[in-house]
């Protein structure tokens, strides 16, 4: 239900050329590009980031892959090498709740970035410890400026959204604390959250997730264990 409700983040209106296909808990997005594809790729990265952000605020942390290449989608079928590439990235490289770009997409972005002194794409993407480029979806908190009457309202809205994001992560950490494989994925998202807040909201200490929540502590044997 959440996936369907937030689809408009990606396909904004009936005039959009993008197409979406949803099945079970998966979503496929196809978007045509022209010329060098910079405008379209920027748009789809923004829209998918917004979609990912909205789902995260509801406690649904998703992973995915982005590829560029030949692809066909209609109401009945989807196929093409770009679909296989994106699926491979999602299945084998994303690992954590992140949307990872494949090598072809990274190459395009590198070309775009080199055309600017201050490239707009740099705020859309982060590079993880394993070298993978992934969507910096929390950067979407900065889109709300035009919806606020002044800077104070804007900052207040940003902090409220990030605090909600923090709470959802903490809920997941607590829920999965006895399943180390799942819990580790939320540790990753917590570290991403803290990184973003440290860089952009250094003075808002209440937005940080405490480090002791991100460690797996051993304990002694209690009466309840015997």
Language-model regions, residue ranges each:
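Short, conserved, surface-exposed binding loops centered on an aromatic residue
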Residues: 54, 91, 125
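Catalytic NTP-binding/metal-coordinating core of nucleotidyl cyclase/transferase enzymes
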Residues: 1-53, 57
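Catalytic-core segments of nucleotide cyclases and related cyclic-nucleotide turnover enzymes
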Residues: 38, 42-45, 52, 73-90
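Catalytic/regulatory signature loops of cyclic-dinucleotide turnover enzymes
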Residues: 57, 63-64, 68, 85-103
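Residues that cap or initiate secondary-structure elements
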Residues: 35, 72, 105-107
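A short glycine-enriched loop-to-beta-strand structural element that forms part of the catalytic core
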Residues: 21-30, 60-74
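Intrinsically disordered, glycine/charged-rich C-terminal tails and inter-domain linkers
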Residues: 96-226
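A short acidic (Asp/Glu
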Residues: 32-33, 74-81, 110-113
């Amino acid at each position: 239900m959440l996936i369907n409700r937030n689809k408009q983040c990606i396909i904004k209106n009936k005039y959009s050329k993008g197409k979406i296909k949803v099945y079970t808990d998966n979503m496929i997005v196809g978007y045509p590009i022209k010329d060098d594809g910079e405008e379209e790729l920027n748009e789809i990265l923004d829209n998918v980031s917004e979609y990912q952000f909205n789902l995260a605020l509801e406690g649904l942390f998703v992973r995915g892959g982005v590829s560029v290449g030949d692809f066909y989608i209609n109401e009945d079928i989807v196929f093409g090498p770009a679909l296989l590439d994106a699926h491979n990235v999602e299945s084998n490289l994303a690992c954590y709740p992140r949307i990872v770009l494949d090598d072809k997409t990274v190459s395009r972005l590198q070309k775009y970035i080199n055309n600017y002194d201050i490239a707009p794409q740099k705020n859309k993407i982060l590079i993880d410890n394993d070298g993978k480029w992934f969507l910096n979806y929390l950067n979407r908190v900065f889109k709300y400026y035009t919806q606020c009457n002044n800077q104070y309202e804007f900052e207040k809205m940003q902090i409220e959204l990030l605090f909600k994001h923090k709470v959802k992560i903490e809920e997941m950490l607590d829920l999965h604390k006895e399943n180390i494989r799942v819990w580790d994925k939320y540790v990753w998202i917590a570290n991403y959250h803290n990184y973003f807040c440290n860089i952009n909201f250094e003075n808002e200490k209440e937005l940080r997730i405490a480090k002791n929540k991100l460690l797996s502590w051993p304990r002694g044997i209690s009466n309840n264990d015997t």
